[in-house]
Amino acid sequence: MSQYPIKPELQVQGQLSDNERLKAESNHLRGTITTDLKDEITGGFTGDNFMLVRFHGMYQQDDRDLRAERAEQKLEPLHNVMLRARMPGGIIKPEQWLAIDEFAREHTMYGSIRLTTRQTFQFHGVFKPDIKPMHQMLNKIGIDSIATAGDVNRNVLCTSNPVESELHQQAYEWAAKISEHLLPKTRAYAEIWLGEEKVETTETEPVLGDSYLPRKFKTTVVIPPHNDVDVHANDLNFVAIAENGQLVGFNVLVGGGLAMTHGDKSTYPRRAEDLGFIGLEHVLKVAEHVVTVQRDYGDRVNRKNAKTKYTLDRIGVDAFKSEVEQRVGVAFGPSRPYEFTHRGDRFGWVEGIDGKHHLTLFIENGRLLDYPGKPLKTGVAEIAKVHKGDLRMTANQNLIIAGVAAEDKAQIEQLAREHGLLDNVTTQRKNSMACVSLPTCPLAMAEAERYLPTLVTHVEGILSKHGIADDHIILRVVGCPNGCGRAMLAEAGLVGRGPGKYNLYLGGNTAGTRIPKLYLDNVAEAEILAALDSLIGRWSVERNPGECFGDFVIRVGVVAEVKVSKTDFHA
């Protein structure tokens, strides 16, 4: 029940989706998870608990490569969970890293650590007997996975910008404060996983509400001109405005999001909308009330239209903004000027204004594993054993060894080189990204992570063929249209349709401020590569000075520019 007057005309009327029943009946996210944990007959969670464990930071999965074989043997799928940690701003200490490295090696099916586009890490392939010990291990080192999935505010991202150290520290602190402020207040996580004794009290969720949010909600803190967090993929963004190197406030961008459903034209990716400027004293209240307005007016009837972007388009940006202002008790000021110019990570060594050095390592697909001749995961662990600063996961699935003193640079660099963490990589490969997809993601329709290295090699060949091997396009591949790999902000984005088949979208830009448009529908690799060969060839000779590939394909009419997603994206 909202503490604010509700305007029924702004709500979607109709029978609530079953997820709303599930949340309302869950006893503040407890369900019967503890009962399922004791059930040794199945390796999975049953009924409502299958969805409820998401609010605790886990997705139930199975290895889809093994499904058919296990079905033939009359066995259930090889149920396990993927855990996503809550790491606002992606900062992790060396001793924490060594603990998660050991757990991944000893207690997961795949032995890997996966850095993700949510600026955190994931464990894949954790079996039921190891789930509770996993949470207890994380708690012991000061990490949890509360609200990294489910209809809540997810892990809060923050620009990975160690160069401007003071400004980055301020932005990071706001990311951490926002994360804490928007967390569920239920003690379910502590009771179920950490053995906290249940206290008989009347629990309430003052921000999220007792039925939580209509859909997932994503938040960022970003320092222009770097858009490494891809603001337009997120529901709520705080764009840092600085004067003389000091943070003075934020422009607030609301309503970004990339997920859609194939064949459903009521769904589409959308850029975030700039509501205006706020001072630092209002940050937490604004964050809270963007969330409460979405809580009260988001669509709880049709989950496909439940995200903030659809609420904005349905009730109008002005109505949404006005409602937030009324609840906060402050009007947004005029937006302050800023510009995004790029979103890639800065690889190699950079020196911060505080004299500390930072080494950004390229981790293809964010997958840290010991490969033949490239023991990447061991390499990071060896660095963590001697490193005196911290490690920072980026929203581009890479890793920064941050805060290195000048006298320690040589040792860190030697360890990185010895373990294949500083191999020569093309600019194209550094600007390509994929979601996890098969074999673990239950939503995957086509390969993504396992296909990307091969696809990039093909694209590198095309660039070289046309004499522009040092150039690149922002290339992203996702296994389904839910958007985890942010393909709908790429210059060339592949979205899985079925085994070996993708939609090809073109026309994003290097700064991540434009949605691409469908160019080829449901096609295989040969057709995709032929199209890219032709268009990259044209780009190499017809482009204007400094013109990126995405700008070029729009200028010459290959695809139309998506200005307003609701009307343009499917047109």
Curated annotation (Swiss-Prot):
Q: EC number(s) in its UniProt entry?
A: 1.8.1.2
Q: Which cofactor does it need?
A: siroheme; [4Fe-4S] cluster
Report keywords, A-Z: 4Fe-4S, Amino-acid biosynthesis, Cysteine biosynthesis, Heme, Iron, Iron-sulfur, Metal-binding, NADP, Oxidoreductase
The pathway is: Sulfur metabolism; hydrogen sulfide biosynthesis; hydrogen sulfide from sulfite (NADPH route): step 1/1
Q: Where does [4Fe-4S] cluster bind?
A: 435, 441, 480, 484
Q: How is the cofactor bound?
A: Binds 1 siroheme per subunit. Binds 1 [4Fe-4S] cluster per subunit.
In terms of domain of life, where is this protein from?
A: Bacteria
Task: Identify a single GO molecular function assigned to this protein.
Answer: metal ion binding
Positions bound to siroheme: 484
Q: Which Pfam families match?
A: NIR_SIR, NIR_SIR_ferr
Q: Which GO terms describe its biological process?
A: cysteine biosynthetic process; hydrogen sulfide biosynthetic process; sulfate assimilation
Reaction catalysis annotation: hydrogen sulfide + 3 NADP(+) + 3 H2O = sulfite + 3 NADPH + 4 H(+)
Gene Ontology CC terms: sulfite reductase complex (NADPH)
Q: Report the NCBIfam families cross-referenced here.
A: CysI (TIGR02041), PRK13504.1 (NF010029)
PANTHER family referenced in this protein's UniProt entry, alphabetically? SULFITE REDUCTASE [NADPH] SUBUNIT BETA, SULFITE REDUCTASE [NADPH] SUBUNIT BETA-RELATED
Report quaternary structure and partners. Alpha(8)-beta(8). The alpha component is a flavoprotein, the beta component is a hemoprotein.
Q: Which family does it belong to?
A: Belongs to the nitrite and sulfite reductase 4Fe-4S domain family.
Q: What does this protein do?
A: Component of the sulfite reductase complex that catalyzes the 6-electron reduction of sulfite to sulfide. This is one of several activities required for the biosynthesis of L-cysteine from sulfate.
Family matches, as HAMAP family: CysI (MF_01540)
Query: What is the name of this protein?
Result: Sulfite reductase [NADPH] hemoprotein beta-component
Q: Could you tell me which species this protein originates from?
A: Shewanella amazonensis (strain ATCC BAA-1098 / SB2B)
